[in-house]
């Protein structure tokens, strides 16, 4: 049974209208000032949701300095507990980039085990799970379907770290977005075939140029990270 209806009304409405924008500060970004700046920029820029590292102090900062709803990301199920108590509206297993950089990948079995443990700990909290881009597309689709069976509420795709654009400018934006767009499209098509109504969030490698393509590929939401959080000041963000 989906817990989408337990999300704040605005988030639920944006998901259903395929127009949710999430800004990602990074799973490993525990710098309070950095998170504060990203949250303020996200609020000023019209985002609906901010995705931050799973630490209750950061949840407090996000809620204090904006009216945005908060998603927290981790791969350690027990770490979600205190952040949910602090006011996080959504929990997410994902943002694997820092692990990829260390040569650590996530198998379908590992993702499913983390998901099951998280769901057992927090059965009444909306849960999003990222499908690792390191898997072949057909395996990503299979994992997405298995995650639906585990009562996951949102499926997130990724791919930016696996794509190094050959070109600069606008063409580079398109090249970088290909992995996450391909995964989004493939999962969306299979969901349609099987009448699965779980929303898909397309994230990683997206920019203002390619976010509309994600929606065209079947996403209900988009997540942007480095396009925002690697900038140096509030106005640029």
What does each of the following model-derived ranges do?
Residues 2-202, 207-237:
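Alpha/beta enzyme core
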